[in-house]
Curated annotation (Swiss-Prot):
There is a cross-link at residues 58-68 (Lanthionine (Ser-Cys)). The gene is FlvA1.C. One of its GO terms (cellular component) is extracellular region. There is a cross-link at residues 52-55, 69-74, 71-78 (Beta-methyllanthionine (Thr-Cys)). Its main location: secreted. Residues 1-38 form a propeptide. It is found in: Secreted. Keywords: Antibiotic, Antimicrobial, Bacteriocin, Lantibiotic, Lipid-binding, Secreted, Thioether bond. This is Lantibiotic Flvalpha.c. The keyword Secreted applies. Lanthionine-containing peptide antibiotic (lantibiotic) only active on Gram-positive bacteria in synergy with Flvbeta peptides, which are encoded by the same operon than Flvalpha.a. Shows antibacterial activity in synergy with Flvbeta.b, Flvbeta.c, Flvbeta.e and Flvbeta.g. Does not show antibacterial activity when tested with Flvbeta.a, Flvbeta.d, Flvbeta.f and Flvbeta.h. The bactericidal activity of lantibiotics is based on depolarization of energized bacterial cytoplasmic membranes, initiated by the formation of aqueous transmembrane pores.
Length: 80
């Protein structure tokens, strides 16, 4: 039996506990395509909304006009 789950045959996949990994990955990718199929206009709108919300939360937490990240470099400047 081949140890790489992608290269297993259908018959070998029936004998393992996790089943056919390639088929499960295909089902998952189809589900993600259905969820994300709203189009690029909605994606751009969501990106703008998330960026604006992030800036508002950062300002509400005491950041004086710059968006913070969790990096060490930014933390020093945001704490001023």
């Amino acid at each position: 039996m081949n140890k790489n789950p992608i290269y297993r045959s259908e018959e070998e996949a029936k004998n393992i506990a996790c089943g056919n990994v390639a088929a499960e990955l295909d089902e998952n990718s189809q589900a993600l395509d259905a969820i994300n199929g709203a189009g690029w206009k909605q994606t751009i709108a969501c990106t703008i909304a998330q960026g604006t919300l992030g800036c508002l939360v950062s300002y509400g937490l005491g950041n004086g006009g710059y968006c913070c990240t969790y990096t060490v470099e930014c933390s020093k400047t945001c704490n001023k």
